[in-house]
Amino acid sequence: MREENGRQESKFPEGRRININFFWFIIIILTSIIATAVITALSLEAGSEKAVNVGTDTRSEFSKLYNVYDTINANYYEDVDREALIESSIQGMVEGLDDPYSEYMNNEELAQFQESVTGDFEGIGAEVMQEGNRVIITSPMRGSPAEEAGIEPGDEIIAVDDESIEGWTTQEAVQLIRGEKGTDVVLTIVRGEGDPMDVTITRDTIHIDSVTYEEIEGVGHVSINRFQEGTAEEFENKLNMASEDGVEDIIIDFRYNPGGLLDEAVSMINQFIEQNETVLYLEENGGERTEIKTSDDRNDSTEDFNIYILINEGSASASEVFTGALDDLTDATIAGTKSFGKGVVQRTVELGGDSLLKYTNTKWLTPNGTWIHGEGITPDIELVNPDYYRVTMLDPEEVYTEGVSNETVKSIKVALDTLGYDVGDFNETFDASLTETVENFQADNEIEETGDVTGETSTLIMSELREYANSNDAQLDYLINHINGEYTEEEIEEYAEERAQHLEIKDPMNHSLQDADDEDQSTEE
């Protein structure tokens, strides 16, 4: 074969002939093909990315948001925290729902939410409350670091780690007292009339039991303060204890329980309801309903119980799910005051970066199809709390003296009457009779007998009233007296009304859920 067969001839327009080696011709062709493919792929990728960006940026509902974000980033007179802008825009979007139960949670808020779900936190283990401008220990938790360090009910906290907390709220104080397990915190406290003293407490992991049980005058009292992980198991254990104690009547107490995990509530209902029974419905915005049924056999220990459920304006959400189910499916008796009325359910979505979105996605209805939202559950036996539960908190800086006339004066009269002092008429006028009564109170407590309610007198009145309320649970006592046959339903309702005729009873529907949660002044520390 001749050498010319290994060459390819090419003719240019001018007519010149160029001889190209065939091997290099193939290399050139392959290189051109590869380059073309790469360029095409890059072009497609760029075009695709551009299409995505254009598709997002040109959505009309986001155009203002992008314009504001870009304008601030480009023109604000100082450096901008872009992450803060994004976080606040998400917060604003959720707030735009105008739904008190939907919220976006950042890292810190998510940690608090998880504490409410698990019942675990790191701190000293004490309950505190606001009393005027003071932060008071109401109770150290049993076995807690606070109890082991000698903290007692009534101790006033005046400083934390040498930082004065004068004028602080309980929430602000709690944030300072809490801390990592194994670390120390120094509380400066005042006990009674004593001098301030420092108490060093080593923080630990604290678990808040959601269910407590006690037997009172032959009646089992099971109190549930929240629906968290493990509440159903705790509840079952307490019911079994009541059965072993031989009680026939049991009170399930949901007062001031704001709700929590729905599946825990369903499992608790299952203690009294047979398997495969519908205990509530979930309804989506299109009207489609999903039945939620029990999955296990009922607890044999509950078969012989006479069931009473105690609720009030702070009983919401999962508390109402439980109460509504037993109201529809059993002969349980509901007592107390009308519940809060939260008939919607929230779902959570993790968003990354330790943030979470909680939003309302369904309504819930009782087994009979009742939607209690905004209405609450009306008890069979209405048991309103006595007037002293509604006394206005007295500010020690204010002075109430003879001749003053306002609603707070009536609160002072109710408080002193509750503590055993004769106040005469329950009107709004600070008269000579009240001056004499205040002097008697001051004499009994070795305070200067001015007859005015201010300073130490105001503080002592509120302190003694708190102690009285803590040791006299009126609604619970009313119900136990009725169960034990001392009063009929009508008689116990009338008696409760007689003790609640001087201070206005607010409509619970005017409360927000946060109000219901805050109604109990104690805060787990």
Model-derived features with residue positions:
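Glycine-rich active-site/cofactor-binding loop and its immediate structural neighborhood
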Residues: 120-161
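Conserved P-loop NTPase
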Residues: 346-349, 359-390
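Intrinsically disordered, Ser/Thr/Pro/Gly-rich linkers and terminal tails that flank
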Residues: 2-130, 152, 165, 172-215, ...
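Cleft-lining beta-strand/loop regions that shape enzyme active-site pockets
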Residues: 138, 147-149, 153, 161-164, ...
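Generic structural signal for buried aliphatic residues
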Residues: 157-158, 185, 372, 416
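A short amphipathic alpha-helical interaction element
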Residues: 146, 400-464
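PDZ/PDZ-like groove recognition
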Residues: 127-141, 221-223, 390-395, 404-418, ...
